[in-house]
Amino acid sequence: MVEAGGARRHRMTLESGDHTLTLFAYRTGPFRTILFYALTVLTLGIFRLILHWKQKWDVKMRMVPCTFEAAEYIYIIDNHNVSELQPVLRKSNATIPTENGEMRKVPELRWFVYRKLEYVWIDDLNSDESVDEISDNDNCWKTSFEIANRIPCRSLLAVSESNFGLTLSEISRRLEFYGRNEIVVQLRPILYLLVMEVITPFYVFQIFSVTVWYNDEYAYYASLIVILSLGSIVMDVYQIRTQEIRLRSMVHSTESVEVIREGTEMTIGSDQLVPGDILLIPPHGCLMQCDSVLMNGTVIVNESVLTGESVPITKVALTDETNDSVFNIEKNSKNVLFCGTQVLQTRFYRGKKVKAIVLRTAYSTLKGQLVRSIMYPKPVDFRFTKDLFKFILFLACISGCGFIYTIIVMIMRGNTLRRIIVRSLDIITITVPPALPAAMSVGIINAQLRLKKKEIFCISPSTINTCGAINVVCFDKTGTLTEDGLDFHVVRPVMSAVNQEIQKVKLEKSNRTEFMGEMTELTSRNGLPFDGDLVKAIATCHSLTRINGVLHGDPLDLILFQKTGWTMEEGIEGDIEEETQRFDNVQPSIIKPTDDKSAEYSVIRQFTFSSSLQRMSVIVFDPREDRPDNMMLYSKGSPEMILSLCDPNTVPEDYLLQVNSYAQHGFRLIAVARRPLDLNFNKASKVKRDAVECDLEMLGLIVMENRVKPVTLGVINQLNRANIRTVMVTGDNLLTGLSVARECGIIRPSKRAFLVEHVPGELDEYGRTKIFVKQSVSSSDEVIEDDASVSISMCSSTWKGSSEGDGFSPTNTEVETPNPVTADSLGHLIASSYHLAISGPTFAVIVHEYPELVDQLCSVCDVFARMAPDQKQSLVEQLQQIDYTVAMCGDGANDCAALKAAHAGISLSDAEASIAAPFTSKVPDIRCVPTVISEGRAALVTSFGIFKYMAGYSLTQFVTVMHLYWISNILTDGQFMYIDMFLITMFALLFGNTPAFYRLAHTPPPTRLLSIASMTSVVGQLIIIGVVQFIVFFSTSQQPWFTPYQPPVDDEVEDKRSMQGTALFCVSMFQYIILALVYSKGPPFRGNLWSNKPMCALTIFATLLCLFIVIWPTELVLKTLGNVELPSLTFRIFIVIVGAVNAAVSYGFETLFVDFFLLGYWERYKKKRSIEAIIDYVPTTNSDHIRRPSINGVTSSRTESTLLSAEGQQLHMTTSKNGKGGENPHSSALFERLISRIGGEPTWLTNPIPPHSLSEPEEPEKLERTY
């Protein structure tokens, strides 16, 4: 999408895949360029370094805005606010593709490269056109493969039929434009990586610090910091290099391929492939090196590398039924062979090879998109990181105050200029600890090692801290909450008037269609004849294939086929061989029953399963039939879809009742139907799918059991007890999802669930689809009183044929026709907890037609069913927008997009697609989720603790130095070394050794470093430490044996030893140990202190050593540390007592005031006030909505969404779903107000929101003022 004005404007918005890019055009100016280089030289490169850190300043400083026609650089900002500056490249007399894929010449080609994709400028604007006539497609940047986005299917078919391929000149032009077909991860030079690492702000500050220390003759610690920093830089570069090498080895692949060029088959390297090439697929498989469309035959591929689904998939050829349409990779995915997928087998024409036409190459392929998502991951948006820099800024402000104080005091004391400069700069290095980055990583590294021991692998360590803030977990159902496979339960055949005579079964009423009883076997011994249509449909309607003698395919198909006991062969046999060869059809599969050796059925045509169509079909031929044009279509799919395709006269009246009954008990249902076809082989191979998948005859239901994994219930209850919201996001039936949700604890059986549904085609007066709220019957057998005006059970209505026989009409023999649910009538149904469930189609309706309610529904819905992969991703992003920290757990099949979008994606698949998720568990169940969260909480608390410890250490040393600067003194090098190298370094290294607590706490840890509690803790400890040091500093000067410090005169060698310095050093030693113990938090997020045995040992040893240094210092100790002996033993004991009092006061302040009062009472009080404000805020009238501004139909105010999110989180924290939580008096009030906006008459039905009030955008300036 392009803003009006196209090339004549400076700014442009571009939709590129899943990202929205904002582009700005710039060019260099001579004056700005001269000024830039002058300032860089005058500041010795510091100015250039600052611009490197702030690229936006760099652009503003060096360049001037211009039109896109004159642009030399493009400044790009993505939807995560990550920016890049890329040069515009130009080439004269070049060729580019047109929309239909043909190449044409242009006077000049302009492009830039962004994240491995080339964006080409398309300029079709005539000079006489006005600005208003510029369309989105006339002038814009497009990727090289987005240009040819309207290739007609007939063009592809024509290329395939011609069998000529590209000419050498065409290949040369396309290779020049598209480039080589290689996914190459360039290894950046080691020197470049080293330089980039060194010039980061922290390391630049370290360079500044060690420079100051060397000038101050503090060489030992400076050298230690240099060594540690160099080691850290080398390790970081090594890890980056290792990841690049690993990624390159994983994705880089080239091999020889066969193509048709200029009518000749030839073998070339895969890196020479270009779009438009005719590719020959070998019969015994290969690794696809590009995205291509299959033109003939069928191909069996394994797409686990991209989707995580290890089940082989059958790809079919593009047919002429799409002749008039434009080819679309997403819609025609069943015809596309994706790069990186493994071709297992091809079924080819006799004497011919399977052909495919190359569509996309290199990074534009689906595999290339996955690689780019790994190379350029979504930045972790976590407040802790932002607060970290703000806190460092706070420390920098303190150091600024100390800087001014030092200059003033030292000028007053008459110090030399060099000493004033060195001491004032030294105070900055003391206040902002250079070792902070290394210390901060300790907790994350330890958590990562502990996760690895539990077979949970993390490729993004920075995500571990984010896991500590997780408050909602989304689970896929199949393979995640439930077992990966399905077990056969029963079949329910349909006995209709049409097939009674065939089955030789006499019913009481021959004109009725009804279900037979449950049958657990698919054999004649169980009442089903071996050649009954239901058995034949089950045996033939599947996508199984035989590879090396072994059946492969969807596990569900495999289970059902094996249940029939039939056999399958692939090849042409019998009388149909000649007919098949005549019409050049693909070799059919031969299905044979075991009970009759003479019978066999040939699968002539297969319509593969489509998630959008929710069904698959096959055309079957029986060679025993007299007529070769007597074929049968068998279809199977979701009960709803097959019902919509069936002749109503063949469907039992209680069909929906039976379907809902099974679904509510957690069974997965598959409906089966048939249709006789009067087609020959030629027509069967060419017929369109829509022409035959209609007017079907219902055959029955297959009932499959999807068992919940043994650990699922315990894990969900564990999360519920921890007040972590659990959400099911599944592609399965809504009622099946509800049943499994109840069984695994996401919805408690004793609680009522409400279904949010829509009725297609039923519109309100403003043309929007009506939404209804219905109460669901519990999966248990508890009886719920039906109130027709309050709740409509989904299984209470039945389908009855109309008297005219013209189809179904919904009627209800038990309750009234469904009516909207009002808030008043629902009031008595709402207890302390409630659950909402919604299906994907209804969710899509609400997103498009009622966008103002999306946030509220996402805050309270617990089951999202029939969700497509893109809807799963959309849901995760929606939860993130309303301030949830989201984890997504899936088995990799159709969950990749959601796993990538979540704050913490946890994959249960060991497929290569799992590299898109930060966490991968080798144990394929959800027990890893609480482990990841608990380790994340422990790491987060450790990061908080170690940061406050390092800040406390810096401020403690700052206070000590401020006292000594007053007398123109400073700590000796030995004292600094003992503090920095022994006490601080050792405690920082062992701080993160404390393991996570064995169970999840009911409340999450604090996530705001700049919260009142955190700031009060640091400032409070600073005050306590400052007071204690002042007492010791002042008391030392009052002793009768005290000798004042004599500062050096002019350039005299400075003797840093002093009694007051020794006294402050002695008491500060205990303070550093006290800070480590105070900030080393234990339960409920980390283990007890004694669980960290190394730190316990260090604490004991350091305390004893400090006592020895203070009370019984030897001559060696005095000389090494630079201490002055304090003559009085009583005073030395006094220092120890003061340290003990300091410990008691610090621990009491942290425990009683910070933890108990601020984090306990005060936080609960604020939450209570916020909930009361939310209840008063939620609007219940139509006018509330109309007043709220919107942009393109989406509410522009996020205030209500954020408040409702906080309320939704608080409801889950206050009321446990295990039934043991306390009553939440606000749950009913919020729910009633929400219901009044969903199905209540006050909002949607009697006074709905006018659509124009939601879709008319306001000017940005007005919106800003509204906010």
From Swiss-Prot:
CDD domains in UniProt: P-type_ATPase_cation
Catalyzed reactions: ATP + H2O = ADP + phosphate + H(+)
SUPFAM superfamilies the record matches: Calcium ATPase, transduction domain A (SSF81653), Calcium ATPase, transmembrane domain M (SSF81665), HAD-like (SSF56784), Metal cation-transporting ATPase, ATP-binding domain N (SSF81660)
Cytoplasmic face residues: 54-189, 239-390, 446-950, 998-1013, 1080-1097, 1154-1267
UniProt keywords, alphabetically: ATP-binding, Magnesium, Membrane, Metal-binding, Nucleotide-binding, Phosphoprotein, Translocase, Transmembrane, Transmembrane helix
Active site: 476
Membrane topology annotation: Multi-pass membrane protein
UniProt-listed InterPro entries: ATPase_P-typ_cation-transptr_N, ATPase_P-typ_cyto_dom_N, ATPase_P-typ_P_site, ATPase_P-typ_TM_dom_sf, ATPase_P-typ_transduc_dom_A_sf, HAD-like_sf, HAD_sf, P-type_TPase_V
Primary location: membrane
GO BP, one annotated term: intracellular calcium ion homeostasis
Record: residues binding Mg(2+): 891, 895
Extracellular side: 1-32, 211-217, 412-424, 972-976, 1035-1058, 1119-1132
E.C. designation(s): 7.2.2.-
A GO CC term assigned to this protein in UniProt: cytoplasmic vesicle
Disordered: annotated segments: 1232-1256
Location in the cell: Membrane
Transmembrane spans: 33-53, 190-210, 218-238, 391-411, 425-445, 951-971, 977-997, 1014-1034, 1059-1079, 1098-1118, 1133-1153
GO molecular function, one term: P-type ion transporter activity
PANTHER family: CATION-TRANSPORTING ATPASE, CATION-TRANSPORTING ATPASE-RELATED
Family note: Belongs to the cation transport ATPase (P-type) (TC 3.A.3) family. Type V subfamily.
Name of this chain's protein: Probable cation-transporting ATPase catp-6
Species per Swiss-Prot/TrEMBL record: Caenorhabditis elegans
Lineage: Eukaryota, Metazoa, Ecdysozoa, Nematoda, Chromadorea
Gene that this sequence comes from: catp-6
